C-alpha cells in the first residue's frame, strides 16, 4: 500500500488514473488536491502513428533515442502478431514501442520517467492499455505487466538496445550476419554495453514464457527491415 509521502505528484496522478491502490488517506488527498489528466472517452479516437511520431519528436531531440524508439516499435509490431491472445491492433502495439521512452530525454530521473510521460499521454487521448504497458516497462513503478503488450514491451526494450550495440561493433555494422551465439557470448561480458540491464532481459523472457535463443532470433528478425532507420547496415537484399 502506497502513501502520498512515497510518491511524487506526477506519480500520484498516474496511479490514481490507473487505479493503483493507495492508502485511504492518500486516495482522499488525491481526490481533493490532484488535477488528474483528462480522462479518455471510451469511444474517442486514439492518436494515430503519425501523431505519435510527432509527440516523440516534440520531446525527444536526440538521434539515438529516436532510433531506439523506432527499433522497439518495429519489434512490438512483430510481437503483436506473435504474442497477442486475440486480434491485435498492430498499430497500437507499435505506438507503445515508439513512445515508451518519449519523455526520458527531458525527464530522465526515476521520479519523473515514465510518470511525466504517462500524464502527457493521458491528456493526449492515449488508452489506459498503452499507458499501463509503458508504466510497466519500468519495474520501479510497481505497475504490473498484466497484458501481452506490457510483457512484450518489457521483454524487448533492453534487448533491442543490446542487439543494436552488438551489430555496431561488427565489421559489417549489420544484423544480417549476427548470430544468436555471438549475442549470448556478449551478454556474459558485463563490460560490453554495460548500461543494458541483463536481469531485465532474463526476466522479460521468463514472463513471456519463451526460450532465450528463440527470443533473440525473433527480435533480430523483427529489426532487420528497419536497419537503415536505426543506423545499421543491411547487407542482404
Q: What residue ranges belong to the model's regions?
A:
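C-terminal binding/interaction regions
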Residues: 194-200, 210
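Divalent metal-dependent catalytic cores for phosphoryl transfer on phosphate-bearing substrates
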Residues: 88-190, 202
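Cysteine-centered motifs
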Residues: 34-35
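Acidic/His-rich, divalent-metal-binding segments that scaffold phosphate/diphosphate chemistry
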Residues: 43-110
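Cationic, low-complexity basic patches in intrinsically disordered or flexible, solvent-exposed regions
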Residues: 12-13
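Charged phosphate-binding loop/patch that engages nucleotide di/tri-phosphates or the phosphate backbone
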Residues: 203-237
Amino acid at each position: 500500500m502506497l502513501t502520498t509521502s512515497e510518491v511524487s505528484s506526477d506519480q500520484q496522478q498516474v496511479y490514481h488514473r490507473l487505479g493503483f491502490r493507495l492508502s485511504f488517506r492518500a486516495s482522499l488527498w488525491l481526490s481533493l488536491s490532484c488535477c488528474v489528466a483528462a480522462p479518455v472517452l471510451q469511444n474517442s479516437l486514439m492518436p494515430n502513428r503519425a501523431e505519435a511520431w510527432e509527440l516523440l519528436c516534440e520531446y525527444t531531440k536526440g538521434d539515438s533515442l529516436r532510433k531506439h524508439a523506432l527499433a522497439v516499435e518495429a519489434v512490438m509490431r512483430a510481437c503483436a502478431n506473435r504474442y497477442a491472445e486475440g486480434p491485435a491492433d498492430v498499430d497500437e502495439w507499435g505506438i507503445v514501442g515508439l513512445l515508451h521512452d518519449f519523455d526520458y530525454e527531458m525527464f530522465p530521473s526515476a521520479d519523473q520517467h515514465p510518470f511525466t510521460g504517462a500524464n502527457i499521454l493521458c491528456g493526449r487521448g492515449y488508452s489506459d492499455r498503452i499507458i499501463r504497458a509503458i508504466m510497466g516497462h519500468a519495474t520501479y513503478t510497481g505497475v504490473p505487466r498484466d497484458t501481452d503488450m506490457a510483457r512484450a514491451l518489457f521483454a524487448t526494450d533492453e534487448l533491442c538496445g543490446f542487439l543494436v550495440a552488438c551489430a555496431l561493433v561488427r565489421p559489417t555494422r549489420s544484423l544480417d550476419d549476427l548470430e544468436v551465439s555471438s549475442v549470448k557470448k556478449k551478454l556474459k561480458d558485463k563490460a560490453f554495453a554495460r548500461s543494458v540491464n541483463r536481469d531485465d532481459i532474463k526476466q522479460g523472457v521468463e514472463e513471456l514464457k519463451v526460450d532465450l535463443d528463440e527470443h533473440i532470433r525473433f527480435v533480430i528478425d523483427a529489426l532487420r527491415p528497419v536497419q537503415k532507420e536505426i543506423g545499421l547496415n543491411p547487407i542482404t537484399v
